């Protein structure tokens, strides 16, 4: 499933009409786990031909850098592909897997501290299919996100943005991350967060129910 250049037209949104505000740099420079939790309910959007297209994030996973065996920056690994993780909080890190899928991550913390949050699933605006962006590959395919976007800044006037909502916070559940059995003890760390009530969540691994943002 190769991501298209154009986003799905059913994902067109008006951030102002939805009461959304663009996230500032300070949002992304915080603790990675807090960012991963607070991204639940936020919107990931791409501007294409003058219009925003996006989805409300309903599932994320935190990756904690050199000390996390599941992270691409495990033990300080630094390759051209991983380089965006070493940048400032608020950059996009997009990687290509299995020769067919793109996965989008939000870089956190400050430069030199390579941590990130994987966007696992989102739900589009009213009228779009419930599971159109269920899973990291589907999310990127629906929004036309490819590895060409890796390293782009989500803060400022660029074509990708995280928008925060002032509405009620969703009920958030927590579980170990999906597909990281190779990571030893890190495979069991509770670093996956998802909206309990969303049909777009990609997997239903058991999770502890919590409400509100991270403390």
Question: Can you name each region flagged by the protein language model?
Answer:
Residues 2-215:
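Conserved, well-structured core segments that form or line functional sites
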């Amino acid at each position: 499933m190769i991501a298209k250049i154009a986003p799905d037209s059913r994902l067109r949104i008006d951030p102002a009409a939805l009461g959304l505000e663009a996230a500032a740099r300070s949002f992304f420079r915080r603790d990675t786990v807090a960012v991963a939790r607070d991204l639940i309910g936020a919107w990931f959007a791409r501007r294409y031909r003058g219009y925003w297209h996006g989805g409300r994030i309903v599932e994320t996973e935190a990756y904690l850098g050199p000390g996390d065996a599941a992270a691409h920056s495990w033990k300080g690994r630094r390759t051209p592909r991983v380089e965006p993780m070493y940048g400032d909080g608020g950059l996009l890190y997009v990687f290509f897997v299995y020769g067919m899928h793109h996965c989008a991550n939000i870089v956190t913390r400050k430069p030199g501290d390579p941590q990130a949050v994987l966007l696992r699933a989102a739900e589009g605006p009213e009228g779009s299919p419930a599971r159109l962006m269920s899973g990291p590959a589907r999310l990127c395919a629906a929004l036309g996100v490819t590895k060409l976007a890796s390293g782009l800044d989500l803060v400022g006037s660029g074509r990708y943005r995280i928008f925060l909502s002032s509405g009620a916070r969703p009920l958030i559940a927590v579980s170990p991350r999906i597909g990281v059995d190779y990571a030893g003890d890190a495979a069991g760390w509770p670093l996956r967060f998802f909206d309990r009530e969303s049909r777009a969540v990609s997997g239903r691994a058991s999770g502890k129910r919590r409400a509100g943002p991270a403390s």
